[in-house]
Amino acid sequence: MENYTVYLDAETTSGDQIHADIVSYTGLLVRDKDNKIVDEFTYFSRPRISRCYQVDAYLVNGFSPYETEKHEYSNHGLAKKLNETFTRWKNKGHLKFNAFAGYNFDFLLTSQTWFSNLYSFPWLFSTNASQMDTLPIARNMEYYRPEILKTELNKKSNKVFKLSSLCNLNGFPIAKAHTSYDDTVGLKNLTESITKEDLLEQLSKKTISCRDVTFRIFGL
């Protein structure tokens, strides 16, 4: 069976993954051996009228509540389409799901969407599949090899690890930031840039070295 990576991104009505409703969701199915996109989707859905939205969220993703009311899918319809599409993709081979800050948001958001729509088995990301988050990988890469990634500094002189900033500074700018499709393409480009085989090998050696030191300190 072939190995694939599913890059995904969601735009929502809130920054709270438990109470947010998805208004736009993109997935790219990429074959690992040649990084070719073999399938993709972008679904637009209507938020539930029982949920409050955050104005800030709409200001970020560029949607308006009047626009999202006209989207094709209901929240339940979106949950069904995501379940069907990801299940179909899983039948092609082994999948690795990747989202930027996915551990803290996108994976939880999607699973909560399935759960709140009474799907009895919302753990599709971790069953016969694996999860990946490019954000901590980028942080580790930059820590061990600062020359790998260019990062901007905020007003406090701290490094910024926002997706749009990293993509813009490293040669593959996002056409329209905070749209699910363009952010997903940017995530794919960023991930492929920092996960080259030689860089991963060096990072693995550094990680193992730190682990061995920790084991010696604690007598493990």
Residues covered by each model-derived region:
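A short alpha->loop->secondary-structure connector
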Residues: 115-128
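Acidic two-metal-ion nuclease catalytic site recognized across multiple nuclease folds
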Residues: 169, 181, 185-220
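Short, glycine/acidic-enriched loop or turn micro-motifs at the edges of active sites
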Residues: 10-14, 136, 186
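Conserved protein kinase catalytic core
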Residues: 15-17, 139, 189
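Catalytic phosphate/metal-binding cores of nucleic-acid and nucleotide-processing enzymes, i.e., regions
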Residues: 20, 120, 144
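Conserved non-catalytic scaffold segment of RNase H-like nuclease domains
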Residues: 2-117, 157-168, 172, 178
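Short alpha-helix plus adjacent loop in nuclease-associated cores
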Residues: 131-154
